[in-house]
Amino acid sequence: MAEIPIDFPPLKIQEKIATILDTFTELRARKKQYAFYRDYLLNQENIRKIYGANIPFETFQVKDICEIRRGRAITKAYIRNNPGENPVYSAATTNDGELGHIKDCDFDGEYITWTTNGYAGVVFYRNGKFNASQDCGVLKVKNKKICTKFLSLLLEIEATKFVHNLASRPKLSQKVMAEIELSFPPLEIQEKIADILCAFEKLCNDLVEGIPAEIELRKKQLDYYQNFLFNWVQKIRN
């Protein structure tokens, strides 16, 4: 082993590679931590332990609480020929699902998108102007008892359970999405849980991706949410 020659790039490149790998390691750890708290706090039994045993839950199918649509065919050539500020979301899962930006705007407001093909069943919360490709399903909440962010969190967990593995191309169709059943506590509780989990997820990402000058502030904010969530979990377990 001692005699095996190993080639090294210049020190600055070594350090850059090490930093990138450390960032990926940190991001994976944060994502696991977020997923643990999300799954734990969205559990119906745990919600009742936090807010009271008599908290009512209502069960709906997605089709009963949402308008369900699908995106349209948007090619890379179309994106090149129609540049603009509004993102196009596709069935991709990297880069938040962005395929590019165009001047069109098919959707504007608070929505949920999901990937229908390929990496099917991946769910994203959207808020603003955007477009969706034909491999992307779109949900718009129409029931005032439902918090869109809370629904997106539930679907992050549940949607992948309904993916059909057809040959080598997994699929989650509009029809299947429409039939998924989900249970919801009162709106006020949905909003509280969604706000804390979404803030925690954002801080986890900002801590990894942010500029150095902001890291210390992000860590303090993250510590606050970690303690808040930890205390919730302890309350449930006790």
From Swiss-Prot:
Superkingdom field? Bacteria
Q: Which Gene3D superfamilies match?
A: DNA methylase specificity domains (3.90.220.20)
Q: Which GO terms describe its molecular function?
A: DNA binding
Q: Does the keyword Phosphoprotein apply?
A: no
InterPro entries in the record: Restrct_endonuc_typeI_TRD (IPR000055), Restrct_endonuc_typeI_TRD_sf (IPR044946), Type-I_RE_S_subunit (IPR051212)
Keywords from UniProt, A to Z, are:
DNA-binding, Restriction system
| An individual GO BP term | DNA restriction-modification system
User: Which cysteines bridge via disulfide bonds?
Assistant: none
Q: What does this protein do?
A: The specificity (S) subunit of a type I methyltransferase (MTase); this subunit dictates DNA sequence specificity. The single R subunit has multiple frameshifts and is probably not expressed.
Q: What does the entry's domain section say?
A: Contains two DNA recognition domains, each specifying recognition of one of the two defined components of the target sequence.
Q: Which family does it belong to?
A: Belongs to the type-I restriction system S methylase family.
Q: How does the record describe its quaternary structure?
A: The methyltransferase is composed of M and S polypeptides.
Task: Write down what this protein is called.
Answer: Putative type I specificity subunit S.MpnORF201P
